[in-house]
């Protein structure tokens, strides 16, 4: 079946009406959800996959035969596939995640499932960080969870899961003084898709780090989205 993807810019207060319209949209089979609607949409669809229910966020919706909307969260899977394509394996490694919202939560969950040894969590909103910390602590008691460290020495993976680097947001997700301790061996990833080379990735590349862009994560999950 031939399909077309149509970009739709929805205001936050119009999400309810938009999803209600989708239920009666006869030639619509699914929707991709992006910032800032991933958590809001999760609360409004009719059904969630077990993964999306745990994370309370979605980035893809499909319409079931009876018209109900089902949501799933594939950002974590996409991130893992993109990282593996560059040769990064998280098992036994140490990671730092900045941004504990919808996409960050999905990435953190995926890293824990893949056997990450230690994971530092950072978010500008302490409540958001604590919510993810508690979720992971209960589900993955073997993973060492911590707050923002004093140095990035020894960190194998640094992930920006926040909007930092997008137009209108802070350029860097972490203090410059902390970033100045970044090792060249660290794998640095960003979820921001535009610009492709964010300020964080540009800085990391200049230090000799291997970098993973937002579009790489997005493209890695496209097949899974189509199959959902």
Where are the regions that the model predicts?
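Short glycine-rich anion-binding loops that position phosphate/pyrophosphate groups of nucleotides
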Residues: 33-40, 102-103, 163-166, 194, ...
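Glycine-rich adenosine-cofactor-binding loop
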Residues: 73, 83, 88, 92-112, ...
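Active-site capping/gating segments
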Residues: 81, 85, 193-194, 209-228
């Amino acid at each position: 079946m031939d399909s077309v993807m149509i970009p739709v810019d929805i205001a936050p207060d119009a999400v309810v009406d938009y999803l209600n319209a989708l239920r009666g949209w006869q030639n619509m089979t699914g929707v991709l959800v992006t910032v800032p609607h991933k958590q809001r949409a999760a609360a409004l669809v009719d059904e969630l996959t077990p993964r999306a229910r745990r994370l309370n966020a979605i980035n893809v919706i499909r319409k079931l035969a009876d018209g109900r909307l089902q949501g799933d969260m594939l950002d974590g899977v996409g991130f893992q596939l993109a990282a593996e394509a560059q040769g990064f394996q998280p098992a036994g490694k140490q990671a730092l995640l900045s941004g504990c919202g919808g996409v960050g939560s999905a990435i953190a969950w995926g890293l824990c499932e893949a056997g990450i040894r230690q994971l530092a969590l950072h978010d500008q909103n302490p409540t958001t960080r604590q919510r993810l910390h508690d979720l992971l602590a209960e589900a993955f008691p073997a993973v060492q969870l911590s707050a923002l460290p004093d140095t990035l020495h020894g960190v194998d993976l640094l992930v920006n899961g926040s909007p930092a680097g997008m137009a209108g947001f802070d350029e860097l997700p972490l203090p410059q003084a902390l970033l100045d301790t970044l090792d060249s061996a660290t794998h640095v990833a960003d979820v921001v898709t535009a610009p492709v080379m964010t300020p964080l990735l540009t800085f990391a590349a200049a230090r000799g780090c291997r970098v993973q862009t937002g579009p790489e994560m997005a493209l890695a999950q496209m097949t899974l989205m189509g199959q959902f």
